[in-house]
């Protein structure tokens, strides 16, 4: 038995800013096959998408010391009486000491064209060895790549003001994720009331990321855009920029899970995972992650038969530990680089720094662990017309991964990435679903949700690394009070600190 499905979709949307659009093509195919009296099941899925974006190069950058926050920001803050065009039809620009560029001019003088490709393919084979016992193999690959062409014309505000006469940049990245998973699943029922399922498995994930970019400035013409990077004068002067990098990491897991259900009244589940990642130090790549949960369908008990309030009433509780991965795959290793170098005005060339350490190694870097405790009730009343859930939870994150000042000597670099700190989240969640009106021809339902959470950074220090708070971000001008966002022990994440105003000086 074989069945298949295929789809193709095309969509184009124009942006709210002139000369901007997004064009998308999506295609997919799915094939399923059964054989040997349905004991063997095969499935294959393939999905591909192509996206083309015409945008405005509107990244946050700087002209001199003045930040540029983009076209929409500039359209709001600029003098509304400033003209858009000069009498000769060219764009009006003030070239003042402030970043008061013409937002309409930027639409036409800066372009950013992006092309995205996404490929997702997976294959699964499952075979029933004996009744109740199945084995499965799963293979998947996801591949994303993007090409960006970014060009600023010679007369564009920042180029003309800085005398750089045009800027062209090409950037490409590719992200690949491969997954292999093997599982064995067993389920059985004893006397129709004892229902048992079990799972054993192994998974392997491989991540690979590559990026390349090249940028040049000082062009004689805008005709070529980003298609003739070598024509820019910065390349001859040794000031053109090129960057590339490649990152790889692996994640391996062994796991097991068991579920038990007695006659729909009592439920219990337990699982264990042993996971290892190349992102952690040599001494702590592996960690255990257990979980347990239980449920009690109170409304099915004999003593509940005489009551008429609850149609459904279920109690449940669970506790589990999960792990978090750092974003950078090399935080535990000693990496080296040349630094940014410097421009030598006397020789007219770049001075390149020699190779030196970028970070200190930490062979003891380990998993962040998230401990979660959840207790809740599910209920139904009024013949099923009112249903809801209520939950209380407590989540504690231990061994937070962060950067701390390092002792010099003996360490080479002045900071180190390590595990310090604890954060706690506690809260209540309530969800209600009511069938307010239900007739033959009309029905009306209402939903209500409520949540409350208390967050606290309980610790930022240990016996070796000390910190009571860490300043993060500034507030924007005017009236910048300095660092206003702070991580501080005993306070919630995202706490704001600033001067206390006593009033206005008359």
Describe the predicted segments one by one:
Residues 1-20:
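Short strand-turn segments of transmembrane beta-barrel domains in outer membranes
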Residues 16-17, 26-118, 138-252, 300-371, ...:
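Surface-exposed loop/interface segments of Gram-negative outer-membrane beta-barrel transport/assembly proteins
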Residues 27-32, 288-296:
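Feature captures outer-membrane beta-barrel proteins of Gram-negative bacteria and organelles
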């Amino acid at each position: 038995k074989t069945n298949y499905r295929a789809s193709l979709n095309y969509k184009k949307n124009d942006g709210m800013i002139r000369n901007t659009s997004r064009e998308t093509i999506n295609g997919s195919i799915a094939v399923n096959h059964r054989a040997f009296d349905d004991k063997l099941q095969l499935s294959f899925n393939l999905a591909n998408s192509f996206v083309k974006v015409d945008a405005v190069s509107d990244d946050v950058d700087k002209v001199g010391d003045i930040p540029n926050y983009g076209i929409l920001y500039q359209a709001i803050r600029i003098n509304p009486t400033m003209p858009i065009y000069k009498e000769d039809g060219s764009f009006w620009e003030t070239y003042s000491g402030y970043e008061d560029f013409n937002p309409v001019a930027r639409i036409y003088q800066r372009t950013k064209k992006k092309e995205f490709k996404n490929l997702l393919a997976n294959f699964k084979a499952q075979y029933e060895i004996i009744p109740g016992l199945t084995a499965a193999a799963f293979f998947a690959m996801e591949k994303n790549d993007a090409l960006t062409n970014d060009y600023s014309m010679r007369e564009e505000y920042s180029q003309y003001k800085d005398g750089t006469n045009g800027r062209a940049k090409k950037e490409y990245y590719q992200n690949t994720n491969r997954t292999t998973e093997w599982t064995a699943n067993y389920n059985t029922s004893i006397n129709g009331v004892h229902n048992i399922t079990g799972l054993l498995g192994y998974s392997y994930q491989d991540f690979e990321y590559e990026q390349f970019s090249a940028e040049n400035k000082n062009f004689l013409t805008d005709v070529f855009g980003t298609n003739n990077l070598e024509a820019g004068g910065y390349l001859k002067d040794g000031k053109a920029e090129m960057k590339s990098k490649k990152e790889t990491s692996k994640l391996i897991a062994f796991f097991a899970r068991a579920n038990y259900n007695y006659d729909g009244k009592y439920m219990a589940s337990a699982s264990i995972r042993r996971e290892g990642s190349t992102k952690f130090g040599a001494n702590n790549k592996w960690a255990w992650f257990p979980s347990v949960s239980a449920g009690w369908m109170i409304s099915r008990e004999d003593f509940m038969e005489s009551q008429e309030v609850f149609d459904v009433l279920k109690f449940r509780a669970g506790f589990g530990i999960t792990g978090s991965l750092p974003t950078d795959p090399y935080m535990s290793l000693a990496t080296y680089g040349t630094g940014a170098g410097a421009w030598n005005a006397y020789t007219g060339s770049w001075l390149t720094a020699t190779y030196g350490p970028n970070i200190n190694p930490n062979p003891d870097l380990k998993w962040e662990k998230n401990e979660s405790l959840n207790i809740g009730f599910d209920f139904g009343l009024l013949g099923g017309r009112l249903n809801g859930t209520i939950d209380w939870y407590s989540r504690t994150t231990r061994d937070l991964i962060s950067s701390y000042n390092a002792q010099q000597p003996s360490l080479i670099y002045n900071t180190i990435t390590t595990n310090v700190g604890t954060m706690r989240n506690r809260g209540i969640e309530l969800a209600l679903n009511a069938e307010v009106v239900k007739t033959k021809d009309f029905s009306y339902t209402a939903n209500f949700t409520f949540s409350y959470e208390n967050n606290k950074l309980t610790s930022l220090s240990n016996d070796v690394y000390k910190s009571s708070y860490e300043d993060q971000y500034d507030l924007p001008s005017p009236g910048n009070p300095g660092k206003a966002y702070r991580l501080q022990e005993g306070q919630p994440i995202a706490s704001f600190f600033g001067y206390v105003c006593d009033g206005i000086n008359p």
